[in-house]
Swiss-Prot record:
Name under which the protein is recorded: F-box/LRR-repeat protein 8
Keywords per UniProt: Ubl conjugation pathway
Organism this protein belongs to: Bos taurus
PROSITE patterns to which the protein is assigned, alphabetical: FBOX
InterPro entries according to UniProt: F-box-like_dom_sf, F-box_dom, LRR_dom_sf
Subunit relationships: Directly interacts with SKP1 and CUL1.
The keyword Membrane belongs to this UniProt entry's keyword annotation: no
Pfam families (alphabetical): F-box-like
Chain's role: Substrate-recognition component of the SCF (SKP1-CUL1-F-box protein)-type E3 ubiquitin ligase complex.
Boundaries of every F-box domain copy: 2-48
SUPFAM superfamilies associated with the record: F-box domain (SSF81383), RNI-like (SSF52047)
Amino acid sequence: MAEPGEQLPEEVLALIFRHLPLPDRAAAARVCRAWAAAATCSAVWHDTSISCDCELEGMLPPYLSACLDHVQNLWLEFEPSRKSSRRAATDLLTALTGRTPGLRGLCLECRGEKPLFDAGRDVLDAVHALCGAASALRHLDLRRLPFSLDDALVLQVAHGCPELRSLFLDNRTLVGSVGPGSVLELLEACPCLRALGLHLASLSRTALEALAAPERAPFELLALRCACPEDARAPPLPDEAWAALSLRHPGLQVELELEPVLPAESVTRVLQPAVPVATLRLSLSGDTVGPVRFAARHYAATLRALEVRAAASAELDAALEELAARCARLREVHCFCVVRPSVLHAFRARCPRLRSYTLKVTREPHPWRPTLVA
């Protein structure tokens, strides 16, 4: 009688196994010879997600280790407060360092809180070494690492990964340690970069001018997070530099996230009329009404998503209604305070492309879930 796996072609089994989590892939490989061959073929491992909780215990040698050469895009999750999870993540990154000819994408995500005063040197050193060896890396996402990223890491990425297409450094650390000089060097070393996430303090007028250079490849996304004291003290980026960048890259989308650390005068410096803002997230400790009105009057042609965290007020309701009337291309709006019914009606009536919204007209228990528009 044929083994169960021999009834299906290896290509079909591979399509199934590629969607299995790591423990289930290991279990499938133990069923029979045909399943073992399918579970370890390259197609199964091109896009791999690994959670470093129980998944790596005893599995790196030999099962996972034998498949590392096949990994092209890796999403790696770990808990920084758990030594076993953290060690598993750094061990895996270290193992990849010597076997990275095919690695194209890396996304790291921390789950839970990191220990107090933890600089994450073990994790960052492993990432640093990996970027020095992964010359074909095209996508690096460090947004969900809770550690301060520095110039040394950015320069390692710049010179070790010349094929880079996207780099996201706009994480939630409260200290900005990436200087404008290293970002400029990154742009010079990676001419194909088309998406970049930074803290505001890491960006300079010179970098905007470099992105607007005639020989530059099309640039598509710039995500800016303003959340640490360095961001609040950052010099203004002139409106004319933004205008030149938008002219050079008409498809450019800018994501702006403004956090409570920004005083009102800093918000005014950041919100320049010529910035092609597609996504605006406002979580300010001061005035929110002014920025919402500014967005309504200057970003009507580009704004696609708005998120507001503020105290409810009649002035905010009026500003939101003005934005609904002007920003007809809006696809998402999420306001995490109670609004009057006319605000909900304004967005439903004036924004025909709206696909998702969080607009509560009465108090409800949290978490608030968005409403999807059919």
